C-alpha cells in the first residue's frame, strides 16, 4: 500500500501555517542559525523544478538545526521589480503591480505546496513601499556621503525598448530581450561609487567560506592591477595623453599607440587625409557593446589617425591608431602597444603590418609575443635587467623625469545605477531650478511610485515618470523655488542588495532593522543560490553592506559567511530547461502525481548538490518507491502502526542505526545530501530483514528523514503515538562504541594468492588467526599434500601461509 500524498501533505501544510510552527522566536538564548535562499523574481511562468533544489537544501539544514537546538531564521520574499513585469504592462496595458501580485500569489502557493519551513510572518516584497522606503533611505545616505553622483556616460541605448541596457543585456549589438538594435550614446546617469570599496571588496574575500571559483570571479571582476601611468606627447602639438601599463619595463619596445574611438583627442589629432576613414570607424563602433568590443576571439580592426606620439624613453615617433578593443571607460582610454611582448598588440601589429621590436629576451618574437621574464635588450638603461627590477627602475625614471608615475588601477567601474523605466524604486532626489539638487528628507520617505496608465517610455531617454507632470513638478514650500523630481528609477539589483537585513526585522517602521536584532542574527550563516549571481548581485550586496557598516547600521563587515551554489537541473536530453525547447518540468505536476516529499527527495538524491544533472522520470519514480517502502515498513494495510514495533532499543538494528545517525548528520552538515539519503536507504533495507523494530531506532529514523520528507515524517510521527509536530524534537545522537565491529573480514593467502575470506572476532590475536585459517575447509583443501613452512598473521587484515 502506498501513502496518499495529497491528503497527508495538505494536512501538514495547513497544520504548520495554522500553528505558525516555523515562526521565529526572538526571546530565547539558543544559538542562532540564519539560512537564506536567493529570493526569486516572481515571473509569470511560475516556479520551475530548478528553484526547489536550492530551497530544499536550505530547508534540510534549517529543519536539522531546529532539532539540534538552534534558533533558526529561514525566511522567503520576492524580488519583484524588474523589466519583465514592465514589458508585460507595455504589451497588455495592464498594471505591473497587479501582474506582480498575481505572480507572487502563485509563487507563494507553489512554494507552500513543497513544504518548506519558512517563517511566513517575515515575507517581504521589494515593491512594497514599506520595504522600498529603506532602499531609498540607503540611497540618500550614499548620496550624502558622495557615493551617489550624476555623470555623463556612454550607455547602451535601445530606441525600441526606450531604455538603457547593461552590458550584460546586449548581445551582438542587439538587446537580449526582443533582439532590438542598440547604439552607444552619452547620457546623464546616476552612478554609485563602488570603486571606493574596491580594495576592501578584494581583501575581505579571504575570510569568507565561499567557493574558490566565485571568489576568483569577483577578484577578476574587480581586477586590481599594479603598474605605471606613462605620459606621451603628440608630435607637433601641445596635446598629451596618458596610458596605464602593467609593463612599464617594455616602454622601449612600444611600436604604436591606440586610443579608444570615443577618446576626446581623436577629432583634434586626426589628419584631413584620415578623417573620412576615422569618422566611419567611430560610427561603426557606436553600435557595439563593451563585451563585444573586448572579445579576444574576434579579428582586430582599427584605423590610423595620421598623428604620431613621442615615446618619452627614446624620442621615437609612434603612429596613433584608434581601435574598438580600447574602451574610453576603462583605464585612460589609451594604450601603448608593445607587440613583441603582448598577445593582443602582436595580433594587431600582424593585421596592419606594424613593426615588432624585441626588448625582453627569451622567445621568438617573429612568430609570437613573448610575455615571460627575461633579460632586457634594446632598452637603454634597462639592458641586462630582469622584469621585476626593470619595472622598478623604469617607474623611478618616469617619476624623476615627470614622464609618469606608479599607479594601481581596477577593472571595476562605478555602478551605473539609473534605469529609464517605470517599474522600479523612484530615486529620491529633486533637481531645483537654480541648478542644485537635494535628497528627499528621511521623514518624507517612501517616495511612492505613482500609479499611471502611461507606462510607455517617454522617448526622450527619460523614464515614463517624466510623463506624469503633477508628480514630477514640485515647489519648495519654504522658498517657493521650483524643481523637478528625478525621473530615473533604480535597477532591479537595488532591492536585493539588502533584503537579508529586512528579514531580520521586517515590520520595523522606524529603522531598516533594530541594531539588537542585527547584532543577534548577522552574518547570514548559509546562503544558497545559483552561480549566475556570482559577480553582480553578490558584489553589489557586499558593497552596500560595507557602506552600512561604515555608517554604523550593521555590525559585520560581510553579509554572507558561507555561500553555496547549487547546480542546474537540465532537461532529460541534457539541455538547459527552457520554454522554447519545451522541456520545462512544472513542480505543480510532480506534486500532484508523486508528491512534494518525492520531489524534495529526488532533487537531493540526483547527485552532488553543486553538479548540473539531467532530470529523469525514472529517478523520480525511484524516489517515490523508496518513500512507499518506508510507509509500508511502518504502516499495515489497514492504516495502523505495524505490530513489529518493540519498546526501547535492543540489539536488533543497533549498529546500522548508530551508523545511520552518524553518516546522515555528517553528510547533511556538509551538504552531501545524496550520500546521506543513501544511508537512510541502507537502514530501511536492514529494517526489512529484521523481525522486530525497536522504537528508539525507528523514531530516530523518522527524525532523520523529516528534513527531506517532512510531510511523511510528520504523519509517521503521529502514527507512532506522538502529538504535535516533529519539527522541534531532538535530533538523534549516536554512540561511537556501537559503531565498533565485533567481527572483521580477513583474507587468507596461500603463497601470496588469496584463497579464502573469513569473518573472525575483531580482537583475534595472531595465534587465534593461524588456527582459524588452518581450520577453514577451503584452506584445508588447498594445503593437502603440502608442508607449511611459515605462517604470517596480521590481526584485522590477513593470514599468509607459505607452503610447498
UniProtKB/Swiss-Prot annotation:
| Residues where ATP binds | 579
Q: Which UniProt keywords apply?
A: Aminoacyl-tRNA synthetase, ATP-binding, Cytoplasm, Ligase, Nucleotide-binding, Protein biosynthesis
The keyword Aminoacyl-tRNA synthetase is annotated on this UniProt entry: yes
Say yes or no: keyword Nucleotide-binding present: yes
Principal place of residence: cytoplasm
Q: EC no.?
A: 6.1.1.4
TM segment ranges: none
- UniProt-annotated location(s): Cytoplasm
Superkingdom of the source?
Answer: Bacteria
Q: Where is the short sequence motif 'KMSKS' region located? A: 576-580
Position of sequence motif 'HIGH' region = 40-51
Q: Name one Pfam family in it.
A: tRNA-synt_1
The Gene Ontology CC terms held by the record are: cytosol
* Catalyzed reactions: tRNA(Leu) + L-leucine + ATP = L-leucyl-tRNA(Leu) + AMP + diphosphate
Name the Gene Ontology biological process terms: leucyl-tRNA aminoacylation
**What GO molecular function annotations does the UniProt record carry, in alphabetical order?**
aminoacyl-tRNA deacylase activity; ATP binding; leucine-tRNA ligase activity
- Family named by the database record: Belongs to the class-I aminoacyl-tRNA synthetase family.
Name of the protein in its database record: Leucine--tRNA ligase
Organism from which the protein derives: Bacillus velezensis (strain DSM 23117 / BGSC 10A6 / LMG 26770 / FZB42)
UniProt lineage:
Bacteria, Bacillati, Bacillota, Bacilli, Bacillales
This chain is encoded by the gene named: leuS
Amino acid at each position: 500500500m502506498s501513502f496518499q500524498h495529497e491528503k497527508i501533505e495538505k494536512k501538514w501544510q495547513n497544520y504548520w501555517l495554522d500553528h505558525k510552527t516555523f515562526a521565529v522566536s526572538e526571546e530565547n538564548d539558543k544559538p542562532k542559525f540564519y539560512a537564506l535562499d536567493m529570493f526569486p523574481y516572481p515571473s509569470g511562468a511560475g516556479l520551475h523544478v530548478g528553484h526547489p533544489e536550492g530551497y530544499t537544501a536550505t530547508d534540510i539544514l534549517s529543519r536539522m538545526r531546529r532539532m539540534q537546538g538552534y534558533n533558526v531564521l529561514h525566511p522567503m520574499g520576492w524580488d519583484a521589480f524588474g523589466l519583465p513585469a514592465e514589458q508585460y504592462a507595455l504589451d497588455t496595458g495592464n498594471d505591473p503591480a497587479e501582474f506582480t501580485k498575481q505572480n507572487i500569489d502563485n509563487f507563494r502557493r507553489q512554494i507552500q505546496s513543497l513544504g518548506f519551513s519558512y517563517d511566513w510572518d517575515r515575507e517581504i516584497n521589494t515593491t512594497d513601499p514599506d520595504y522600498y522606503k529603506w532602499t531609498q533611505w540607503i540611497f540618500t545616505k550614499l548620496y550624502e556621503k558622495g557615493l551617489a553622483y550624476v555623470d555623463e556616460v556612454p550607455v547602451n541605448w535601445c530606441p525600441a525598448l526606450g531604455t538603457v541596457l547593461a552590458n550584460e543585456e546586449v548581445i551582438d549589438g542587439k538587446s537580449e530581450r526582443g533582439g532590438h538594435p542598440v547604439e552607444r550614446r552619452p547620457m546623464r546617469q546616476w552612478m554609485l561609487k563602488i570603486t571606493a570599496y574596491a580594495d576592501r571588496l578584494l581583501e575581505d574575500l579571504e575570510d569568507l567560506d565561499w567557493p574558490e571559483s566565485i571568489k576568483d570571479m569577483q577578484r577578476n571582476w574587480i581586477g586590481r592591477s599594479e603598474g605605471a601611468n606613462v605620459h606621451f606627447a603628440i608630435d607637433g602639438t601641445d596635446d598629451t595623453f596618458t596610458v596605464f601599463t602593467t609593463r612599464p619595463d617594455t616602454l622601449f619596445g612600444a611600436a604604436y599607440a591606440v586610443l579608444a574611438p570615443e577618446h576626446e583627442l581623436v577629432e583634434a589629432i586626426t589628419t584631413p587625409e584620415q578623417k573620412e576613414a576615422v569618422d566611419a570607424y567611430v560610427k561603426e563602433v557606436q553600435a557595439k557593446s563593451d563585451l563585444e568590443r573586448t572579445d579576444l576571439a574576434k579579428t582586430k580592426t582599427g584605423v590610423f589617425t595620421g598623428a604620431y606620439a613621442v615615446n618619452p624613453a627614446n624620442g621615437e615617433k609612434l603612429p596613433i591608431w584608434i581601435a574598438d578593443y580600447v574602451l574610453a571607460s576603462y583605464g585612460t582610454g589609451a594604450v601603448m602597444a608593445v607587440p613583441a611582448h603582448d598577445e593582443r598588440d602582436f595580433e594587431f601589429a600582424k593585421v596592419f603590418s606594424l613593426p615588432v621590436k624585441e626588448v625582453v629576451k627569451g622567445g621568438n618574437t617573429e612568430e609570437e609575443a613573448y610575455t615571460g621574464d627575461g633579460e632586457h635588450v634594446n632598452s637603454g638603461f634597462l639592458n641586462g635587467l630582469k622584469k621585476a627590477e626593470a619595472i622598478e627602475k623604469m617607474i623611478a625614471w618616469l617619476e624623476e623625469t615627470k614622464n609618469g608615475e606608479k599607479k594601481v588601477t581596477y577593472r571595476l567601474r562605478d555602478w551605473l545605477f539609473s534605469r529609464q523605466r517605470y517599474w522600479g524604486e523612484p530615486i529620491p532626489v529633486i533637481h531645483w531650478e537654480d541648478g542644485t539638487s537635494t535628497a528627499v528628507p528621511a521623514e518624507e520617505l517612501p517616495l511612492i511610485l505613482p500609479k499611471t496608465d502611461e507606462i510607455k517610455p517617454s522617448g526622450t531617454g527619460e523614464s515614463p515618470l517624466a510623463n506624469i507632470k503633477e508628480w514630477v513638478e514640485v515647489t519648495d514650500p519654504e522658498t517657493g523655488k521650483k524643481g523637478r523630481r528625478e525621473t530615473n528609477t533604480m535597477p532591479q539589483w537595488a532591492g536585493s542588495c539588502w533584503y537579508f537585513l529586512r528579514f531580520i526585522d521586517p515590520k520595523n517602521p522606524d529603522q531598516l532593522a533594530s541594531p539588537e536584532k542585527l547584532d543577534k542574527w548577522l552574518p547570514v550563516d548559509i546562503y544558497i543560490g545559483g552561480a549566475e549571481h556570482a559577480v553582480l548581485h553578490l558584489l553589489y550586496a557586499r558593497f552596500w553592506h560595507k557602506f552600512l557598516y561604515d555608517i554604523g547600521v550593521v555590525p559585520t563587515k560581510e553579509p554572507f559567511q558561507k555561500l553555496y551554489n547549487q547546480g542546474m537541473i537540465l532537461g532529460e536530453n541534457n539541455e538547459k530547461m527552457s520554454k522554447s525547447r519545451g522541456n520545462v518540468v512544472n513542480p505543480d505536476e510532480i506534486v500532484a502525481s508523486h508528491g512534494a516529499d518525492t520531489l524534495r527527495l529526488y532533487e537531493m538524491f540526483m547527485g552532488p548538490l553543486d553538479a548540473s544533472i539531467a532530470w529523469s522520470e525514472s529517478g523520480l519514480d525511484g524516489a517515490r518507491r523508496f518513500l512507499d517502502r518506508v510507509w509500508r515498513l511502518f504502516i499495515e494495510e489497514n492504516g495502523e502502526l505495524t505490530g513489529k514495533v518493540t519498546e526501547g532499543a535492543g540489539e536488533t538494528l543497533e549498529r546500522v542505526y548508530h551508523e545511520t545517525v552518524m553518516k546522515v548528520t555528517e553528510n547533511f552538515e556538509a551538504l552531501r545530501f545524496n550520500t546521506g539519503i543513501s544511508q537512510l536507504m541502507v537502514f530501511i533495507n536492514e529494517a526489512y530483514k529484521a523481525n522486530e523494530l525497536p522504537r528508539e531506532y525507528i523514531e530516530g529514523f523518522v527524525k532523520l528523514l523529516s528534513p527531506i520528507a517532512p510531510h511523511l515524517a510528520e504523519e509517521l510521527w503521529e502514527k507512532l503515538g506522538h502529538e504535535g509536530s516533529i519539527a522541534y524534537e531532538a535530533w538523534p545522537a549516536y554512540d561511537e562504541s556501537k559503531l565498533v565491529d565485533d567481527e572483521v573480514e580477513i583474507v587468507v593467502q596461500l603463497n601470496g594468492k588469496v584463497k579464502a575470506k573469513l569473518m573472525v572476532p575483531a580482537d583475534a590475536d595472531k595465534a587465534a588467526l593461524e588456527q582459524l585459517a588452518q581450520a577453514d575447509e577451503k584452506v584445508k583443501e588447498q594445503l593437502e599434500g603440502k608442508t607449511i613452512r611459515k605462517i604470517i598473521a596480521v590481526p584485522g587484515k590477513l593470514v599468509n601461509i607459505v607452503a610447498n
